[in-house]
Amino acid sequence: MKNKKLLVMAGGTGGHVFPAIAVAQTLQKQEWDICWLGTKDRMEAQLVPKYGIPIRFIQISGLRGKGIKALLNAPFAIFRAVLQAKKIIQEEKPDAVLGMGGYVSGPAGVAAKLCGVPIILHEQNAIAGLTNKLLGKIATCVLQAFPTAFPHAEVVGNPVREDLFEMPNPDIRFSDREEKLRVLVVGGSQGARVLNHTLPKVVAQLADKLEFRHQVGKGAVEEVSQLYGENLEQVKITEFIDNMAEAYAWADVVICRSGALTVCEIAAVGAAAIFVPFQHKDRQQYLNAKYLSDVGAAKIIEQADLTPEILVNYLKNLTRENLLQMALKAKTMSMPNAAQRVAEVIKQYSN
């Protein structure tokens, strides 16, 4: 009997791509074939084939920040992308399509509707992006990570890597820690410039009380090392973190942005967090962070309010006991079966 096939529509950032990979791998274990639809110039083009998943491309890009010419050409570009996606769908003959966000999802979702293929949509953020708002009107089923993006969609969490759930629980991790509090600073793959420029001034005041690890992002090690100056030996600086599960588990508290995937990873491992949301116009990261801050698992410091003094005052008053309580609360908010639940819905609605 022929295997069923899923076409994944996701691209642009890790927040869209990694959860989609988790769902794809879940279905691969159940004898499903997977094909990916993306764009050639975004991260999925290099990343997805490393997981043994074939990928095909359409031409589409975002309009934010583009000039008037791009806006005038947009209807033609979208129409062309829909036709390209329709041709690929007719060739691949998927039993369902999964939309996980990114520019590619829009025209590909419309093409799937035209071809009569069931559309399962997953919104990773606490507020839906424009593409998913529009696709939500034609999707067969809409799922969401947080309870605030769509009024009536099922809340399933964000599919995250399984190794995060395999870490010991916070009370076990914290049980033999008596040394300095451990602070992990995560800037993400691009690095968070505001964190890179603020933390050296924080470490200068707290290096004798706290232990720091700082992931600074691509190409930023030299610049940030210079900012640390004479305190450089007091902090471990890395460009990337290869083993995020281990890094989260090492930390007593994590300072980071609050992208949807990061928030769900922190919940999965059970870690206390200080979130500095990126200043989106739609407050996307702030609303993601509230998922944990509202239950006392995290502290939010708005970027406009972030100063070395505010961070120093907050950090120096922390104890391992209150960080453990925050970590335990974060763990209660995790949804370990997100990838499996999305996979179940895909199977339920597939042709």
Curated annotation (Swiss-Prot):
<keyword id="KW-0472">Membrane</keyword>
<dbReference type="GO" id="GO:0005975">
    <property type="term" value="P:carbohydrate metabolic process"/>
</dbReference>
<dbReference type="GO" id="GO:0051991">
    <property type="term" value="F:UDP-N-acetyl-D-glucosamine:N-acetylmuramoyl-L-alanyl-D-glutamyl-meso-2,6-diaminopimelyl-D-alanyl-D-alanine-diphosphoundecaprenol 4-beta-N-acetylglucosaminlytransferase activity"/>
</dbReference>
<feature type="binding site">
    <location>
        <position position="161"/>
    </location>
    <ligand>
        <name>UDP-N-acetyl-alpha-D-glucosamine</name>
    </ligand>
</feature>
<keyword id="KW-0133">Cell shape</keyword>
<comment type="similarity">
    <text>Belongs to the glycosyltransferase 28 family. MurG subfamily.</text>
</comment>
<dbReference type="GO" id="GO:0071555">
    <property type="term" value="P:cell wall organization"/>
</dbReference>
<keyword id="KW-0132">Cell division</keyword>
<feature type="binding site">
    <location>
        <position position="241"/>
    </location>
    <ligand>
        <name>UDP-N-acetyl-alpha-D-glucosamine</name>
    </ligand>
</feature>
<feature type="binding site">
    <location>
        <position position="189"/>
    </location>
    <ligand>
        <name>UDP-N-acetyl-alpha-D-glucosamine</name>
    </ligand>
</feature>
<dbReference type="GO" id="GO:0050511">
    <property type="term" value="F:undecaprenyldiphospho-muramoylpentapeptide beta-N-acetylglucosaminyltransferase activity"/>
</dbReference>
<feature type="binding site">
    <location>
        <begin position="260"/>
        <end position="265"/>
    </location>
    <ligand>
        <name>UDP-N-acetyl-alpha-D-glucosamine</name>
    </ligand>
</feature>
<feature type="binding site">
    <location>
        <begin position="13"/>
        <end position="15"/>
    </location>
    <ligand>
        <name>UDP-N-acetyl-alpha-D-glucosamine</name>
    </ligand>
</feature>
<keyword id="KW-0808">Transferase</keyword>
<dbReference type="GO" id="GO:0030259">
    <property type="term" value="P:lipid glycosylation"/>
</dbReference>
<dbReference type="GO" id="GO:0005886">
    <property type="term" value="C:plasma membrane"/>
</dbReference>
<keyword id="KW-0328">Glycosyltransferase</keyword>
<dbReference type="InterPro" id="IPR004276">
    <property type="entry name" value="GlycoTrans_28_N"/>
</dbReference>
<dbReference type="GO" id="GO:0009252">
    <property type="term" value="P:peptidoglycan biosynthetic process"/>
</dbReference>
<dbReference type="GO" id="GO:0051301">
    <property type="term" value="P:cell division"/>
</dbReference>
<comment type="pathway">
    <text>Cell wall biogenesis; peptidoglycan biosynthesis.</text>
</comment>
<feature type="binding site">
    <location>
        <position position="285"/>
    </location>
    <ligand>
        <name>UDP-N-acetyl-alpha-D-glucosamine</name>
    </ligand>
</feature>
<keyword id="KW-0961">Cell wall biogenesis/degradation</keyword>
<dbReference type="InterPro" id="IPR007235">
    <property type="entry name" value="Glyco_trans_28_C"/>
</dbReference>
<dbReference type="Pfam" id="PF03033">
    <property type="entry name" value="Glyco_transf_28"/>
</dbReference>
<keyword id="KW-0573">Peptidoglycan synthesis</keyword>
<feature type="binding site">
    <location>
        <position position="125"/>
    </location>
    <ligand>
        <name>UDP-N-acetyl-alpha-D-glucosamine</name>
    </ligand>
</feature>
<dbReference type="Pfam" id="PF04101">
    <property type="entry name" value="Glyco_tran_28_C"/>
</dbReference>
<comment type="function">
    <text>Cell wall formation. Catalyzes the transfer of a GlcNAc subunit on undecaprenyl-pyrophosphoryl-MurNAc-pentapeptide (lipid intermediate I) to form undecaprenyl-pyrophosphoryl-MurNAc-(pentapeptide)GlcNAc (lipid intermediate II).</text>
</comment>
<dbReference type="GO" id="GO:0008360">
    <property type="term" value="P:regulation of cell shape"/>
</dbReference>
<keyword id="KW-0131">Cell cycle</keyword>
<dbReference type="InterPro" id="IPR006009">
    <property type="entry name" value="GlcNAc_MurG"/>
</dbReference>
<keyword id="KW-0997">Cell inner membrane</keyword>
<keyword id="KW-1003">Cell membrane</keyword>
<protein>
    <recommendedName>
        <fullName>UDP-N-acetylglucosamine--N-acetylmuramyl-(pentapeptide) pyrophosphoryl-undecaprenol N-acetylglucosamine transferase</fullName>
        <ecNumber>2.4.1.227</ecNumber>
    </recommendedName>
</protein>
